Protein backbone atom coordinates (compact mmCIF):
# COMPACT_ATOMS: atom_id res chain seq x y z
CA UNK A 1 0.00 0.00 0.00
CA UNK A 2 2.89 2.34 0.59
CA UNK A 3 4.04 1.88 -2.96
CA UNK A 4 0.73 3.00 -4.33
CA UNK A 5 0.61 6.19 -2.23
CA UNK A 6 4.13 7.06 -3.39
CA UNK A 7 3.02 6.98 -7.00
CA UNK A 8 0.00 9.14 -6.28
CA UNK A 9 2.00 11.91 -4.63
CA UNK A 10 4.78 11.76 -7.18
CA UNK A 11 3.39 13.78 -10.04
CA UNK A 12 5.93 15.26 -12.52
CA UNK A 13 3.48 17.11 -14.74
CA UNK A 14 4.46 20.61 -13.50
CA UNK A 15 8.25 20.19 -13.66
CA UNK A 16 8.52 21.47 -17.23
CA UNK A 17 6.46 24.56 -16.39
CA UNK A 18 8.69 25.37 -13.41
CA UNK A 19 11.86 24.90 -15.47
CA UNK A 20 10.40 27.09 -18.21
CA UNK A 21 9.52 29.80 -15.67
CA UNK A 22 13.10 29.76 -14.38
CA UNK A 23 14.73 29.90 -17.82
CA UNK A 24 12.50 32.50 -19.56
CA UNK A 25 13.85 35.58 -17.70
CA UNK A 26 17.42 34.58 -18.55
CA UNK A 27 16.52 34.06 -22.20
CA UNK A 28 14.78 37.46 -22.30
CA UNK A 29 17.85 39.23 -20.91
CA UNK A 30 20.05 37.47 -23.47
CA UNK A 31 17.64 38.38 -26.29
CA UNK A 32 17.50 42.06 -25.28
CA UNK A 33 21.29 42.10 -24.99
CA UNK A 34 21.65 40.68 -28.50
CA UNK A 35 19.21 43.25 -29.89
CA UNK A 36 21.04 46.10 -28.14
CA UNK A 37 24.40 44.82 -29.39
CA UNK A 38 23.09 44.51 -32.94
CA UNK A 39 21.69 48.05 -32.77
CA UNK A 40 25.07 49.40 -31.60
CA UNK A 41 27.03 47.56 -34.29
CA UNK A 42 24.65 48.51 -37.11
CA UNK A 43 24.72 52.18 -36.02
CA UNK A 44 28.52 52.13 -36.00
CA UNK A 45 28.72 50.48 -39.42
CA UNK A 46 26.25 52.94 -40.90
CA UNK A 47 28.27 55.84 -39.50
CA UNK A 48 31.49 54.43 -40.95
CA UNK A 49 29.80 54.04 -44.34
CA UNK A 50 28.77 57.70 -44.33
CA UNK A 51 32.33 58.78 -43.53
CA UNK A 52 33.59 56.55 -46.35
CA UNK A 53 31.09 58.19 -48.72
CA UNK A 54 32.44 61.62 -47.80
CA UNK A 55 36.02 60.37 -48.16
CA UNK A 56 35.28 59.02 -51.63
CA UNK A 57 33.78 62.36 -52.65
CA UNK A 58 36.87 64.21 -51.42
CA UNK A 59 39.17 61.78 -53.24
CA UNK A 60 37.16 62.32 -56.44
CA UNK A 61 37.84 66.05 -56.20
CA UNK A 62 34.90 67.57 -54.31
CA UNK A 63 35.89 70.99 -52.98
CA UNK A 64 32.64 72.16 -51.38
CA UNK A 65 32.97 70.99 -47.78
CA UNK A 66 29.39 71.95 -46.87
CA UNK A 67 27.97 69.85 -49.71
CA UNK A 68 30.23 66.92 -48.83
CA UNK A 69 29.13 67.19 -45.21
CA UNK A 70 25.46 67.21 -46.27
CA UNK A 71 25.96 64.16 -48.49
CA UNK A 72 27.70 62.29 -45.67
CA UNK A 73 24.89 63.06 -43.22
CA UNK A 74 22.19 62.10 -45.72
CA UNK A 75 23.93 58.80 -46.52
CA UNK A 76 24.03 57.90 -42.82
CA UNK A 77 21.10 55.49 -42.55
CA UNK A 78 18.94 55.83 -39.42
CA UNK A 79 21.31 58.30 -37.81
CA UNK A 80 20.49 59.27 -34.21
CA UNK A 81 19.25 62.72 -33.32
CA UNK A 82 22.15 65.10 -32.89
CA UNK A 83 24.39 63.20 -35.31
CA UNK A 84 27.13 65.40 -36.76
CA UNK A 85 29.59 65.14 -39.60
CA UNK A 86 32.40 67.70 -39.71
CA UNK A 87 35.05 68.34 -42.32
CA UNK A 88 38.25 70.22 -41.71
CA UNK A 89 41.12 71.05 -44.01
CA UNK A 90 44.70 71.31 -42.83
CA UNK A 91 47.52 72.70 -44.98
CA UNK A 92 51.03 71.49 -44.12
CA UNK A 93 54.59 72.08 -45.21
CA UNK A 94 56.35 69.03 -43.86
CA UNK A 95 55.25 68.89 -40.23
CA UNK A 96 54.36 72.59 -39.99
CA UNK A 97 50.76 73.76 -40.32
CA UNK A 98 50.47 76.77 -42.66
CA UNK A 99 47.78 78.94 -44.29
CA UNK A 100 46.10 77.83 -47.51
CA UNK A 101 47.76 80.68 -49.40
CA UNK A 102 51.30 79.86 -48.21
CA UNK A 103 53.88 78.11 -50.34
CA UNK A 104 56.53 75.70 -49.11
CA UNK A 105 60.28 75.55 -49.81
CA UNK A 106 60.72 79.27 -50.40
CA UNK A 107 57.64 79.65 -52.58
CA UNK A 108 58.16 76.75 -55.00
CA UNK A 109 55.82 74.06 -53.72
CA UNK A 110 52.15 74.07 -52.71
CA UNK A 111 51.43 72.75 -49.21
CA UNK A 112 50.00 69.29 -48.65
CA UNK A 113 46.26 69.30 -48.00
CA UNK A 114 44.75 66.94 -45.46
CA UNK A 115 40.97 66.63 -45.07
CA UNK A 116 39.72 65.31 -41.75
CA UNK A 117 36.20 63.84 -41.78
CA UNK A 118 34.71 63.15 -38.39
CA UNK A 119 31.28 61.74 -37.52
CA UNK A 120 29.89 61.69 -33.98
CA UNK A 121 26.58 60.74 -32.40
CA UNK A 122 25.03 59.48 -29.20
CA UNK A 123 23.70 55.95 -29.52
CA UNK A 124 20.76 54.98 -27.33
CA UNK A 125 19.75 51.35 -26.86
CA UNK A 126 16.35 50.30 -28.22
CA UNK A 127 15.50 48.51 -24.95
CA UNK A 128 16.29 50.23 -21.69
CA UNK A 129 16.76 47.82 -18.81
CA UNK A 130 19.26 47.41 -16.01
CA UNK A 131 22.92 47.94 -16.84
CA UNK A 132 22.17 48.16 -20.57
CA UNK A 133 20.34 51.47 -20.32
CA UNK A 134 23.37 53.69 -20.85
CA UNK A 135 23.71 55.80 -23.98
CA UNK A 136 27.16 55.87 -25.54
CA UNK A 137 29.10 58.26 -27.70
CA UNK A 138 30.12 56.74 -31.01
CA UNK A 139 32.46 58.30 -33.51
CA UNK A 140 34.60 57.66 -36.54
CA UNK A 141 37.36 59.75 -38.07
CA UNK A 142 39.19 59.54 -41.35
CA UNK A 143 42.03 61.71 -42.66
CA UNK A 144 42.67 61.92 -46.40
CA UNK A 145 45.65 63.52 -48.09
CA UNK A 146 44.32 65.35 -51.11
CA UNK A 147 47.49 66.95 -52.39
Language model segments and positions:
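Short, conserved structural patches
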Residues: 2-3, 44, 52-147
